[in-house]
Regions:
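Hydrophobic, well-ordered beta-alpha structural blocks that scaffold small-molecule cofactor pockets
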Residues: 1-108
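Short, surface-exposed amphipathic charged segments that create phosphate/polyanion-binding patches used
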Residues: 54-59, 113-118, 251-259
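A residue-level signal for conserved active-site and pocket-lining positions in enzyme catalytic cores
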Residues: 73-76, 201, 222, 229
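An acidic, glycine-rich, mixed-charge low-complexity segment common to nucleic-acid enzymes
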Residues: 79, 97-189, 280, 284-288, ...
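Short alpha-helix boundary/capping and kink motifs at helix termini
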Residues: 165-220
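A sequence-level detector for short glycine-anchored, His/Arg-bearing signature motifs
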Residues: 215-233
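Short hydrophobic alpha-helical runs that function as membrane-insertion/retention elements
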Residues: 237-240
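Amphipathic, charge-rich alpha-helical segments that serve as recognition/docking helices
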Residues: 245-295
Length: 297
C-alpha cells in the first residue's frame, strides 16, 4: 500500500493508530492537516500507558474493541523502524492485511515528493542548523561514547576530554532527551541500532540512505546518518530536498530539536548541558575536517 492508497482507504474505512509516541503524533498531525483526524477511532499500545492521546481513548492490544460488520478500519502502525520488527508480526497475526506500517510514509505524507537529489557537503548541512538545536549533537555524542571503547584518535580523544571522566554521559543524555517524545524502550532500541550501523560502517565502509532535507536545509529525516557521517569523516552525503512545509515546526518541536528549554525539561544537569555545548564544537570541527579530507581526494 502506498501513501495515496493509504489516505483514500482511511477516508473510506477509518483508522486505528498503533503507538502513542512521536511517530503516532506525527501521523495524527498529518491526518489533521488533511482534515482526516476525525476518521481515527482510537489508539493502541502493546501495554496501555495512558488513558487518552490527542483526546482519543488508548487501549492495550488485548483490550482493543472488536470491530464488527462492514469494512473494519486500517490498523496503522506508527512506530519507528527500530521496533517495527517486533511489532508488525504481532499486528499482522491478529489483523492480517489490515495492519499497515505507516512510518516509512510519514515524511512523504507531510512534505510531498522531493524536488532534488544529489550530494551535499556534510559540513554545510551542519553549519546551516540553528545554533540552539542540539538534536544532531546528542546523536553524535552518544555515537562517540560507544566508539570510544573501539576506536582511537582525535575524535575519541575530544569526546573523552569533554566527558571529564564520565564516558557514559553521551548515552545517558541520548536516553533522557529522546524519552521526552518517544517511549524509553524505543529510545534504547534506536540507540542500539545507531551503534550497530556504526559497527557495519567500521567493518564494511560507508553506505547509507539519503538524508531528507527541505530547501531551507532543515532536517526532516536522517539525523543519525548525519551524526555517523560526521564521525566517520564523510565529506558529502546524498540528500533529497523537499519544499518547505508549514507543518515543519508543529512536527519538530523544541523537544525534538533539543533546544535549551527542552534540555532543562529533560532533566539534564548543568554538567550535561556544558558537555553538550562542548560536543557541538567538536561536531562542527569534525565536519570541517571531513570536508577538507574529501577535497584532498
Amino acid at each position: 500500500m502506498d501513501r495515496f492508497e493509504l489516505i483514500e482507504t482511511i477516508k473510506c474505512r477509518g483508522a486505528v493508530i498503533f503507538g502513542t509516541g512521536f511517530a503516532a503524533g506525527m501521523f495524527m498531525q498529518i491526518l489533521k492537516e488533511r482534515k482526516l483526524d476525525g476518521r481515527v477511532r482510537y489508539f493502541m499500545e502493546t501495554a496501555k500507558s495512558r488513558e487518552t492521546f490527542y483526546d482519543l481513548p488508548v487501549y492495550s492490544l488485548d483490550e482493543a474493541p472488536l470491530e464488527q460488520g462492514g469494512d473494519p478500519p486500517l490498523i496503522c502502525a506508527a512506530v519507528h523502524d527500530a521496533i517495527a520488527g517486533q511489532i508488525m508480526p504481532v499486528l499482522e497475526k491478529r489483523y492480517g492485511s489490515r495492519a499497515v506500517w505507516v512510518y516509512p510514509m510519514l515524511s512523504r505524507l507531510a512534505f510531498g515528493d522531493t524536488i532534488y537529489t544529489g550530494d551535499i557537503s556534510v559540513r554545510d548541512v551542519i553549519a546551516a542548523q540553528p545554533a540552539e538545536n542540539r538534536w544532531i549533537t546528542v546523536r553524535y555524542a552518544a555515537l562517540c561514547g560507544y566508539r570510544a571503547a573501539k576506536d582511537r584518535g582525535e575524535v575519541v580523544s575530544a569526546y573523552l576530554k569533554a566527558s571529564a571522566g564520565d564516558p557514559d554521559i553521551g548515552r545517558r543524555i541520548y536516553i533522557k532527551t529522546q524519552s521526552r517524545f518517544s517511549r524509553p524502550r524505543t529510545a534504547e532500541e534506536r540507540l542500539k541500532r545507531l551503534w550497530r550501523i556504526s559497527d557495519d560502517i567500521a567493518s564494511c565502509g560507508w553506505k547509507a540512505d539519503p538524508v531528507l532535507l527541505d530547501t531551507d536545509m532543515r532536517v526532516i529525516d536522517g539525523l543519525h546518518r548525519l551524526a555517523l557521517a560526521v564521525y566517520f569523516g564523510i565529506g558529502s552525503i546524498n540528500c533529497e530536498l523537499a519544499k518547505p512545509s508549514a507543518l515543519y515546526d508543529s512536527l519538530f518541536t523544541g523537544k525534538n530539536r533539543i533546544t535549551p528549554a527542552a534540555q532543562t525539561d529533560a532533566g539534564l544537569t548543568e554538567k550535561e548541558i556544558v558537555f553538550l555545548d562542548s560536543m557541538r564544537s567538536c561536531l562542527a570541527t569534525r565536519a570541517e575536517e571531513g570536508r577538507k579530507e574529501h577535497e584532498k581526494r
